[in-house]
Structure formats: C-alpha cells, structure tokens
Amino acid sequence: MAAAIVVAFSLGALLPTAFGRSKAPTAVRTALARSQNVQGAPGRTMVLSKVVVEPGAQLALHHHLGTQISRIAAGTLTYTARKGFAVLHSGDAEKDPKFVRHIEAGQTAPIHPGQWLVEQPSDNHEAANRGSKPVVIYLATLLKTGAPPATPVSKP
C-alpha cells in the first residue's frame, strides 16, 4: 500500500472541523508506482504520484531535483513561476499535444483539467487551489535516487 504524506499546507485560511477546531487545508501526495535505476538514467528513480489539493491549500515555494510532468485531472490549480519557466500543454499527449504557453518567472496562470506542465530542476514555483473543489494532479517525476519529491525554496 502506498503511503500518503502531507506535502504542503496553508499558512493562512483555516477550515472548521467537526469538532469545532480549525485545521489548515492540505495537499496530500500518494506514491502510486516507482522504479529505481531507470534504464538510461542510472542513479535516478521514476515516481508516479497523485496529489489532491484541498480548496484553500497553498503549496509553498519549491522545486524538484529532476524533471516533472504534472497533469491536472480535476479542479483548477493556480500556478506561479518564481524562477525559470514551466511549459504548459493541453490535449491528447500521444496523438495531438498542443503547446499552450510558457509560464515565465513572475507570471501566474490557471491550469485546468486536461492540461499538463513540464517543470525542470531549475524552476522554482508555488501553487494554490483557489476553487471550491479539490484539485487532483497526476505526476511523473524523474528524481535523483533518494531525493525528496519537492525541495522547499526560501522566498527572497
């Protein structure tokens, strides 16, 4: 069974719970599959993950220590590039992928279901779910073996 871990939380908005207390909305990453020492990429691990971002959750500024492809399955993710750029695509990835745009440093863009981002290790970014329904993201990441799925970055 894949372990689910909390990967980010909001520092601001709080949601009421059934017990009268409040909790910060979260994003939960579940590793679905993994392969170490991928052919042609020794010392790397390929990871397939699912992330569910609750309404109001903010993903802190971070980067990945390898190339990552993120496809939005449900909800709308608000994505902000802080360093480098992400490449946004849409459509059928195998038959008819369409380039949508680059999201350059300092730009924010909504990412909708059926769209996907390609991020490189040099790209720092943050994201949020500003909607009322969960955002579901499927990720394929080629990381250095032993590297965390995301590495926090200090804001300037």
Across the structure, where does each feature detected by a protein language model lie?
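Bacterial N-terminal signal peptides
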Residues: 2-13
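Bacterial Sec-dependent signal peptides at the C-terminal "C-region" and cleavage site
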Residues: 11-25
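Double-stranded beta-helix
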Residues: 21-39, 44-45, 124-156
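A short glycine-rich, His/Asp/Glu-containing loop-to-beta-strand
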Residues: 25-60, 66-67, 73, 81, ...
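Short acidic-glycine-tyrosine-enriched beta hairpin
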Residues: 51-55, 83-123
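Short beta-strand His + acidic residue motifs that chelate non-heme Fe in jelly-roll/DSBH
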Residues: 61, 79, 107-108, 119, ...
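Short, small/polar residue-rich loop motifs at catalytic or cofactor-binding pockets
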Residues: 64-65, 104
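Soluble periplasmic/extracytoplasmic beta-strand elements of cell-envelope proteins
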Residues: 71, 78, 118, 138-141
